[in-house]
Design a protein with these regions (language model features):
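Face-selective signature of the C-terminal outer-membrane beta-barrel domain
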Residues: 258, 302-326, 349-497, 520, ...
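Outer membrane beta-barrel strand-and-loop segments of large Gram-negative receptors
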Residues: 291, 408-412, 453-457, 559, ...
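N-terminal periplasmic accessory domains that precede
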Residues: 103-107, 150-153, 187, 201-202, ...
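Short acidic/polar hinge/loop motifs at secondary-structure boundaries
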Residues: 182-207
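Short, acidic Ser/Thr/Gly-rich low-complexity loop/linker segments typical of extracellular
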Residues: 53-67
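Surface-exposed extracellular loop regions of Gram-negative outer-membrane beta-barrel proteins
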Residues: 383-385, 492-494, 519, 523-569, ...
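Extracytoplasmic beta-strand/coil segments of soluble accessory domains associated
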Residues: 151-183
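Short, acidic, small-residue-rich periplasmic hinge/interaction motif at the N-terminus
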Residues: 36, 49, 84-89, 102-143, ...
C-alpha cells in the first residue's frame, strides 16, 4: 500500500507540471510495455512517463503485473520515456510516436546502488547489497563514515579485513583500486574522505569487462553526485576529542542540459601510537626488546570539480578532476634494550604528496534501449617526496631523501548491443603505468655527510597493457540467466636501474575468462555461480627497491624482480529475500600461484622485510550477510566471513608458510526511537589472521552513534563514540625458522566525536523532477 501511495504521489507531481495542452484532442500513439526486475518478477506501481524535451506530457503507474499503457500525440520528433521505482536504477529510452501503437516489450529495472540521503526522514538507507560477484556498501548508512575515510566505510564488509590500515579482501592484499571505475594512483585509501563517497563496490569475482588486475579483487570508490535541480549544497564539520578534526563543503548546480559540482574536504589528526616489540634471531642469538611511541601528524586536503553535459537525448559528456594533497609526518621515540646495552633512537619521517586525477567520459546512444557506445579517458599522477632523519643518542647519524612519481593514463571504449537472444558487450582498453623512483641515503662520518652507495637505489618501471574483451548475457527459459565473457591482456614491462645496471624488458599475455549464472529457485530465492581468472601485477610499494630503516638491524625493501601472481576464483551463492529477512550466503575458493607475499629474510646480521613470490596460496571459505527488519523502528544487520588459508613457498632461506582458520565478522543494530532520530551500535571482531611468517591476534571493537535531524531534515547533529570498550589493537607474532617475534601497538582508538551537517536546497524539486535519493526511501535488503 505504501509503495502504491508513493508511486502515485510521484506521478501526480510530475503530471501537475505538464501544460494543460496535454489534454488537447488529436491523433494519438498508444505506448505499452511491461516492467520487470532482475529476477524477472513484475514491478508493480512503477512510474512511467513520456517527456518531450524536459516537459512531461503523459504518465501512468504499472499494474500488479507490471504492465502499462499510455498515450501521446502523434509526432515525428523524438520523445524520452522514463521508468522509475524506489530501490532501482532509473530506466531511460527514446521513441518516436509516429504510429498508432508502439509495444516496448519488457523493460528491465536494475537494483540501484543506494544514493546518500542524509536528510531523508521517511525511511531507512540500505547499508549494503551483495551478489555473487560484488558487494555494494552505502557510505552514509554507517555513522562512523561521517568522520572518517574510505577505510571506515570498508569495515562494514565482512569480506574486507583491515589490519594496521592495510586492506585485504578475503585475506589477499593484492587489490586493484579504482575511482569511479578508472585506475588511480591513490592506493592509500586513508587519504580519501568518506564525505565524498556515495558508495564503494567490493568486487570479489569480477567479470571480463573489468581489468584483470587484482587477484584479491577490486575496490571501486564511487563519488557523490547530487542530482537535485537548481543550486544546492552541504557543509559539514566533525571534531574528535582530542585533536582530530575534518570539514567538508559540497556544491552542485543542475539544469536540464548541464550539471556542475564542487567539493572540498580538509582533515587534521595527531595520533599517538604506543608499541612494544620482542625479537630474537636464531642464527646469531641477537635479541632486542623495543618500546616505541609514534606521533602521527596528518593534514590532508581534497578538492574535486566535475561537470555533466547532456548535449541532446543521445549524447552525454562528463568531465571530472580531483586533487588530493596528503601530508604525513611521523616522529618516533624508540628505546631498545639488548643483552648488554640499551639504545635510544629517534626517527623523523615525512611524506609529501600531490595526487591529481582527471577523467572524461562520452556516451552516444546509437539506438535507444538497443545500442550505445562509451569512450573514456583518464589520467592519474602523483608527485611524492619522503625526507627522513634518524638519530641515535640525540645525534643525527643517518638521513635520506626519496621520492617517486607514479603515472597512470588510460583510454577505453565500450560498446553494448541488445539482440532478441541476449546482450553483447565488447570493449578495448589501453593502460600505461610508470614510476620513476629515487632514494639517496647519507651517513655521518667524521662530521661529514657521506653518500651511501650501498643503501641508495633508483628504479624506472613502465608497463603498457592493451586489453580487449567480449561478453554475452542472456537467459534460458524464465528462471535461468547467464553471462559469459573473455578478456585478453598483453603487457610489456620494462625495468631500468642505473645504480644496479639493470635494463630488462618482459612481455606477458594473460587470458581472463569469466562465467556467471543465476537460477531463480522461487520468487524470492536465487542460486548463483561465478568463475573468473585474475592476474595480480606487483604494486609500486612491492617493487620499490630502496631500503627504509626501521632500526639499526631491521630494514624494509621492495623487490624489483617480482612475478605477477595468477588466481582462479569460484563463487557459489544463495540469496533469500522476504519483507523481514534478507539472507545472502556465498561459498568461495581462491587458488593463486606465484602468490606475492611479504617476507623477512636474513642479510648478514640484518633482517630485511621484503616481498617474494610464494609457490601457491589457497583460500576457501563461506561469507554470510543477514538483515532482519523486526519493526519500522528497528533492524539488525550481521556479516561474517570464515575461511581456511594455506600458503607454501621458500625465499632465500625463509619459509613462506602458514595456515589456519580466520573469521571476520560485524554486527550493526539500528534504532529509530523518535522522529528524526537514529541510534546505531556496531561491533567488529576479527579472529587471528594467517600470513606467511606472521599471525595476527584477535581484535574487536564497538562503536555507538546517535544522530538527530532538525529543520525538516536539513540539519543533522551526531554524537559518536568509537571503540567504546577501548579494545582495538594491533598484535602480531611469529615463530619461524629465522626468528621469533611478538609486536603489538595501540593508538587513540576510543574517541568521542561531535558532528554537524547542513543541507540547503538539496531536495527542493522543481516540477516533476525526481532525485536519485527517492529510491532509498522504502527499499529494504542488502
Amino acid at each position: 500500500m505504501i509503495k502504491k501511495i508513493v508511486a502515485s504521489t510521484l506521478l501526480i507531481i510530475a503530471l501537475c507540471c505538464a501544460p494543460f495542452t496535454l489534454f488537447a484532442q488529436g491523433a494519438k500513439c498508444t505506448i505499452s510495455g511491461k516492467v520487470i526486475d532482475q529476477q524477472q518478477a513484475p514491478v508493480a506501481y512503477a512510474s512511467v512517463a513520456i517527456y518531450q524535451d524536459t516537459r512531461p506530457i503523459a504518465g501512468v503507474v504499472t499494474n500488479n503485473e507490471g504492465k502499462f499503457s499510455l498515450q501521446a500525440n502523434l509526432s515525428t520528433t523524438e520523445h524520452r520515456i522514463a521508468v522509475e521505482f524506489i530501490g532501482y536504477e532509473k530506466y531511460e529510452g527514446f521513441i518516436v510516436p509516429n504510429k498508432a501503437h508502439i509495444d516496448l516489450g519488457t523493460i528491465l529495472l536494475k537494483e540501484a546502488a543506494v544514493e546518500v540521503a542524509e536528510v531523508v526522514v521517511t525511511g531507512k538507507e540500505v547499508a549494503q547489497k551483495s551478489t555473487v560477484e560484488h558487494t555494494t556498501i552505502n557510505a552514509s548508512a554507517n555513522m562512523t563514515s561521517s568522520k572518517g575515510t574510505a577505510i571506515d566505510v570498508l569495515r562494514s564488509a565482512s569480506s574486507v579485513s583491515i589490519s594496521n590500515d592495510e586492506i585485504a579482501i578475503r585475506g589477499n592484499k593484492n587489490i586493484l583500486v579504482l575511482m569511479d571505475g578508472v585506475p588511480t594512483t591513490a592506493s592509500d585509501l586513508s587519504t580519501i574522505p568518506a564525505a565524498n563517497i556515495q558508495s564503494i563496490e567490493v568486487i570479489t569475482n569480477p567479470d571480463a569487462s573489468h581489468d584483470a588486475g587484482g587477484t584479491g579483487g577490486i575496490i571501486n570508490i564511487i563519488s557523490k553526485r547530487n542530482r537535485a535541480e537548481g543550486f544546492s549544497g552541504m557543509v559539514a564539520a566533525n571534531y574528535g576529542f582530542n585533536h582530530f578534526a575534518n570539514g567538508n563543503i559540497a556544491l552542485s548546480y543542475n539544469r536540464p542540459k548541464t550539471s556542475w559540482r564542487f567539493s572540498y574536504n580538509v582533515k587534521y589528526e595527531d595520533d599517538v601510537v604506543n608499541s612494544t616489540l620482542n625479537r630474537k634471531v636464531h642464527s646469531t642469538g641477537y635479541a632486542v626488546f623495543q618500546q616505541m611511541q609514534s606521533t602521527r601528524y596528518t593534514f590532508n586536503n581534497n578538492i574535486s570539480l566535475g561537470a555533466d553535459f547532456r548535449i541532446d537525448p543521445r549524447n552525454r559528456l562528463s568531465v571530472d578532476a580531483k586533487m588530493i594533497i596528503p601530508r604525513l609526518n611521523i616522529k618516533q621515540d624508540l628505546h631498545n634494550t639488548f643483552a648488554d646495552h640499551t639504545e635510544v633512537r629517534y626517527n623523523d619521517v615525512t611524506w609529501n604528496r600531490v595526487n591529481v586525477e582527471g577523467s572524461v567520459a562520452y556516451t552516444h546512444i546509437i539506438k535507444p534501449d538497443v545500442s550505445d557506445i562509451t569512450l573514456r579517458a583518464s589520467v592519474s599522477k602523483i608527485w611524492g617526496e619522503r625526507p627522513s632523519h634518524y638519530f641515535v643518542g640525540g645525534i643525527e647519524n643517518n638521513r635520506s631523501v626519496s621520492g617517486g612519481s607514479p603515472f597512470i593514463p588510460s583510454l577505453q571504449a565500450d560498446y553494448k548491443r541488445k539482440f532478441s537472444i541476449g546482450t553483447l558487450s565488447a570493449g578495448a582498453k589501453l593502460t600505461y603505468r610508470q614510476n620513476d623512483v629515487y632514494h639517496e641515503f647519507y651517513e655521518l662520518t667524521n662530521g661529514e655527510w657521506i653518500y651511501s652507495d650501498k643503501m641508495s637505489k633508483d628504479m624506472l618501471h613502465t608497463e603498457l597493457t592493451p586489453a580487449a574483451y567480449a561478453m554475452f548475457s542472456s537467459r534460458i527459459g524464465k528462471k535461468f540467466t547467464y553471462k559469459v565473457g573473455l578478456r585478453g591482456e598483453f603487457s610489456t614491462t620494462t625495468l631500468n636501474s642505473k645504480h644496479d645496471a639493470i635494463n630488462e624488458r618482459e612481455n606477458d599475455f594473460f587470458v581472463a575468462p569469466s562465467l556467471s549464472g543465476t537460477y531463480k529457485v522461487a520468487e524470492n530465492q536465487d542460486l548463483s555461480l561465478a568463475l573468473s581468472r585474475r592476474i595480480g601485477r606487483p604494486t609500486y610499494p612491492q617493487l620499490i627497491p630502496y631500503m627504509s630503516m626501521v632500526d639499526a638491524t631491521t630494514y624494509e625493501q621492495g623487490n624489483m624482480h617480482l612475478n605477477p601472481e595468477k588466481a582462479t576464483k569460484v563463487d557459489l551463492s544463495y540469496n533469500l529475500r522476504t519483507e523481514v529477512v534478507n539472507l545472502f550466503v556465498n561459498g568461495y575458493l581462491n587458488y593463486t600461484t606465484d602468490y606475492i607475499s611479504q617476507v623477512t629474510k636474513m642479510d648478514g646480521e640484518r633482517l630485511i622485510t621484503t616481498y617474494a613470490n610464494a609457490d601457491k596460496d589457497l583460500k576457501t571459505g563461506v561469507e554470510l550477510s543477514l538483515k532482519i527488519t523486526l519493526a519500522k523502528w528497528f533492524n539488525f544487520t550481521a556479516g561474517a566471513n570464515t575461511y581456511y588459508v594455506t600458503t607454501k613457498g621458500v625465499f632465500e632461506g625463509a619459509h613462506i608458510d602458514n595456515s589456519g582458520w580466520t573469521n571476520n565478522s560485524n554486527m550493526m543494530l539500528n534504532f529509530t526511537p523518535w522522529k528524526g532520530g537514529d541510534i546505531q551500535l556496531q561491533y567488529f571482531v576479527t579472529t587471528p589472521q594467517y600470513y606467511p611468517q606472521l599471525t595476527t591476534s584477535l581484535t574487536h571493537q564497538m562503536n555507538i552513534g546517535i544522530k538527530q535531524r532538525f529543520f525538516k531534515g536539513a540539519m543533522t547533529v551526531s554524537v559518536l563514540l568509537t571503540d567504546a570498550l577501548n579494545t582495538a589493537k594491533w598484535e602480531v607474532w611469529s615463530h619461524n625458522n629465522l626468528f621469533d617475534l611478538k609486536n603489538n601497538s595501540k593508538n587513540k582508538s576510543r574517541m568521542l566525536w561531535l558532528g554537524v551537517s547542513y543541507n540547503f536546497n538539496s531536495f527542493k524539486q522543481r516540477g516533476g523532477q525526481k532525485t536519485e535519493n527517492d529510491r532509498s526511501l522504502i527499499r529494504l535488503g542488502m
